[in-house]
Amino acid sequence: MEKQLFNGRKSLVIGGTGGIGRQIALQLADSGAEVWVMGRHRSEDSQLHMIQADFDRGGLSELFRPDVREILSQCEICAVTYGPFLQKPVHEMSAEEWSHIAIADYALPGAVVSAVLPGMMERKWGRILLFGGTRTESVRSYRTNAAYAGAKTGISVIIKSVSAEYKEYGITCNGILPGFTRNAPSEEYLVEESWVAEQGIHLISSEKLNGVLLNADCGWQPR
């Protein structure tokens, strides 16, 4: 990986204290970016700046904190990897669960994008990376996780809309739709977190890749 690819670029990874988000944060840092991570668990990685936040409890209110708003306004590279998964058939979903999934998996990434865009527009440069669900690039049926998949399908609309509307400002917006990083139905469909992160870095690094919905799932299809 090119050490100075993102030299000095202020970067924020929401959900960057674990999993794919942590791998993206570390790879950004290795490429010269100045990286902040937001998450519930404290990061032990010395090259990352930590902003502790609990979106499961605080929801969108975490974005209104002065320290968070300052980072969002300065952000040149933004990745939102946070997105809780819920597997339940529709008839078992409570109103509270519908609300939580809608906020956490759709409204929160959208609000983050709205917050970082003005600064990126002013600087005429920006990179946004969002995460959908497995095969949520189009409308399809999901038997046991309709709420989650519905919210993540909406993320694809945000990606396509931002990529079209803000490309004139030097801003790109792309998405990864990852497969199973654990508990795969079979070994052939298992993807490594570090590999998914590498695909994210590739999308961020190119000004010509814009509006991409990248299926990173070894060809798995929902049934």
Predicted regions and their residues:
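Conserved NAD(P)H cofactor-binding loop of Rossmann-fold oxidoreductase domains
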Residues: A79-Q87, C218-G219
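N-terminal Rossmann NAD(P)H-binding glycine-rich loop of SDR-like oxidoreductase domains
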Residues: T17, A25
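Substrate-binding pocket helix/loop in short-chain dehydrogenase/reductase
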Residues: P89-V90, E97-S99
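C-terminal helical subdomain
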Residues: E168-I171, G175, E187-P222
